[in-house]
């Protein structure tokens, strides 16, 4: 079953689903700055575009481009800066 989610007044939209027992979501973020909370560990992969990310425990912002991925621990939060619409894939670990 597909779960459609909308965050930040419609600036971030995602579709969540299960594939072979794994929870995943795909989505698009419009330009802006966002803070996301995590319940479970996540692996984010940039599909198209780029994002600047400040992960928990990191002082510096990191830039991730299409094809790059990064992990975020569960029960934490991370900040994202988007300069132009960016597509992503999120795997819940």
Curated annotation (Swiss-Prot):
EC top class, as a word: transferase
Molecular functions (GO terms): guanosine phosphorylase activity; purine-nucleoside phosphorylase activity; thymidine phosphorylase activity; uridine phosphorylase activity
Keywords: Glycosyltransferase, Transferase
Database matches in Pfam families: Ppnp
Superkingdom field: Bacteria
Protein family: Belongs to the nucleoside phosphorylase PpnP family.
HAMAP family linked to this entry: Nucleos_phosphorylase_PpnP
Function: Catalyzes the phosphorolysis of diverse nucleosides, yielding D-ribose 1-phosphate and the respective free bases. Can use uridine, adenosine, guanosine, cytidine, thymidine, inosine and xanthosine as substrates. Also catalyzes the reverse reactions.
Descriptive protein name: Pyrimidine/purine nucleoside phosphorylase
UniProt xrefs under InterPro entries: Ppnp, RmlC-like_jellyroll, RmlC_Cupin_sf
E.C. no: 2.4.2.1, 2.4.2.2
Entry GO terms, CC: cytosol
Reactions it catalyzes: a purine D-ribonucleoside + phosphate = a purine nucleobase + alpha-D-ribose 1-phosphate; adenosine + phosphate = alpha-D-ribose 1-phosphate + adenine; cytidine + phosphate = cytosine + alpha-D-ribose 1-phosphate; guanosine + phosphate = alpha-D-ribose 1-phosphate + guanine
């Amino acid at each position: 079953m597909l779960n459609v989610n909308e965050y930040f007044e419609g600036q971030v939209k995602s579709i969540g689903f299960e594939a072979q027992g794994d929870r995943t979501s795909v989505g698009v973020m419009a330009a802006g700055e966002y803070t996301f909370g995590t319940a479970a560990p996540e692996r984010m992969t940039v599909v198209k575009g780029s994002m600047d990310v400040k992960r928990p425990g990191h002082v510096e912002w990191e830039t991730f481009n299409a094809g790059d991925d990064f992990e975020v621990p569960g029960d934490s939060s991370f900040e994202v800066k988007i300069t132009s619409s960016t597509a992503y894939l999120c795997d819940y670990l």
